[in-house]
UniProtKB/Swiss-Prot annotation:
Keywords: Cytoplasm, Protein transport, Transport. One of its GO terms (cellular component) is ESCRT II complex. InterPro entries: ESCRT-II_cplx_Vps25-sub (IPR008570), ESCRT-II_cplx_Vps25-sub_N (IPR014041), WH-like_DNA-bd_sf (IPR036388), WH_DNA-bd_sf (IPR036390). Component of the ESCRT-II complex (endosomal sorting complex required for transport II), which is required for multivesicular body (MVB) formation and sorting of endosomal cargo proteins into MVBs. The MVB pathway mediates delivery of transmembrane proteins into the lumen of the lysosome for degradation. The ESCRT-II complex is probably involved in the recruitment of the ESCRT-III complex. It holds the Pfam family ESCRT-II. Component of the endosomal sorting complex required for transport II (ESCRT-II), composed of SNF8, VPS36 and 2 copies of VPS25. GO terms for biological process: protein transport to vacuole involved in ubiquitin-dependent protein catabolic process via the multivesicular body sorting pathway. It comes from Danio rerio. The keyword Cytoplasm applies. The lineage of its organism: Eukaryota, Metazoa, Chordata, Craniata, Vertebrata. It is found in: Cytoplasm. Belongs to the VPS25 family. One of its GO terms (molecular function) is structural molecule activity. This is Vacuolar protein-sorting-associated protein 25.
Amino acid sequence: MSFEWPWQYNFPPFFTLQPNVDTRQKQLAAWCSLVLSYCRHRKLYTLDVLEAQESPVFNNKKIERKLSVEAIQVVFEELRKKGNLEWLDKNKSRCLIMWRRPEEWGKLIYQWVSKNGMVNSVFTLYELANGDDTEKEEFHGLEDWMLLRSLQALQTDGKAEIITMDDGKGVKFF
């Protein structure tokens, strides 16, 4: 299944941050939406600012336009403000991208657990993210850091408890 680009992606001015405040706000909202949709489609969880400039999301070779590194940082800062991005280093060169926040992943996981009658069951983190039973679920293949944060959100809500097992971490659902 190929990614469907929004109409703005083929509009050259989209690749230059606009000076008008209202226009810029709409433009940044469109960029944020595009980045999250693209990362979701490709199941990307980490991004590098310099590498991002060469990726298709910020570099439209068809119209020969690419977003500057400075503009990418503005888009990333907007994503951070919305809770969809977290910097991995002080230089702000690498980041975690959360196209779905931990609470949202937790809700999806808990719905699956409930739907399949597995409340009061214990799972390893591997079973949840990579097991045969979850193969058709959206959270299948979820990176460990995001899975753990999702389960921590469920633990805060009293729906799960993260436990330490001999071979790593596990979780019990309530």
